[in-house]
């Protein structure tokens, strides 16, 4: 099974496709395409629609899976309802936003949206979550004292874990210009790293930290930071494509 991974396009999907046109053969011929969040810049519905239209029209034979990221406010019912509607959290407002999300997703029935949920294809089990550690109240942020219990719900038997943010120490090193004195240069989630040690997925795909783009192997897990934009938001990072052997559950980067 050929799987391509992308992330963090921030409305620049068209520019990215043009900039990487000579490196997209495997991408356009993949069996599965996985997007790890941050399709938008400011989380507006029109930004999300524009991306989903592009994503939906990629390789029609491919299964396309996506999650939201911390920029994708539209998908966060609590955040969007609380801030855009100018009200405190209230169930009725959350339901209104949820209906808007469902209405939009119905336009693209072939796209698989994961929000702390799973999907199985040809025996390969995917599980996706948009949650990231707290950072100035962006979408899907969780405080340190609650994010640990969140990751504990990741099933034990998944093959491919998709999150927006990285685990601590893997693909999470900030570019020097973003590093601050007396603050950790690695900004991934230690609680997520702990649960990865429990779950032991074949692949963990993420983005969020653009400068961490690339692949990392630790024990038997292949970690993929698939950020398509670099730290300067230039769309220069190509997709990362792997071949997954369905019998041995081993991977090869192609």
Where are these regions (language model features)?
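N-terminal active-site segment of His-dependent metallophosphoesterases
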Residues: 1-66, 72-78, 153-157, 162
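Beta-strand-turn-beta hairpins that frame and shape the catalytic cleft
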Residues: 1-4, 111, 118-128, 156, ...
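Conserved catalytic scaffold of divalent metal-dependent phosphoesterases
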Residues: 9-11, 42, 57, 66-187, ...
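Short, glycine/charged-enriched secondary-structure capping and boundary segments
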Residues: 18-21, 48-51, 79-83, 141, ...
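Binuclear metal-dependent phosphoesterase catalytic core
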Residues: 120-122, 191-199, 203, 210-254
């Amino acid at each position: 099974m050929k799987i391509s991974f992308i992330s963090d396009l921030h409305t620049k999907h068209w520019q990215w496709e043009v900039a990487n046109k000579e490196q997209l053969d495997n991408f356009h011929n993949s069996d599965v395409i996985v997007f790890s969040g941050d399709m938008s810049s400011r989380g507006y519905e029109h930004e999300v629609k524009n991306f989903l239209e592009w994503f939906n029209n990629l390789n029609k034979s491919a299964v396309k899976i996506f999650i939201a990221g911390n920029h994708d406010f539209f998908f966060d019912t609590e955040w969007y309802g609380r801030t855009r509607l100018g009200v405190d959290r209230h169930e009725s407002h959350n339901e209104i936003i949820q209906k808007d999300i469902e209405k939009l997703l119905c336009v693209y029935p072939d796209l698989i949206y994961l929000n702390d949920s799973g999907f199985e294809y040809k025996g390969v089990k995917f599980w996706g979550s948009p949650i990231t550690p707290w950072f100035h109240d962006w979408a899907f942020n969780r405080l340190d004292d609650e994010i640990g219990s969140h990751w504990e719900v990741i099933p034990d038997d998944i093959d491919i874990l998709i999150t927006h943010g990285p685990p601590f120490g893997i693909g999470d090193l900030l570019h020097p210009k973003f590093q601050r004195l007396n603050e950790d240069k690695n900004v991934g989630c230690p609680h997520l790293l702990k649960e990865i040690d429990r779950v032991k997925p074949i692949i963990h795909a993420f983005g969020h930290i653009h400068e961490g783009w690339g692949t990392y192997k630790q024990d038997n897990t292949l970690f993929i930071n698939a950020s398509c934009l670099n730290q300067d938001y230039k769309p220069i990072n190509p997709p990362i494509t792997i071949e997954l052997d369905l019998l041995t559950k081993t991977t090869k980067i192609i």
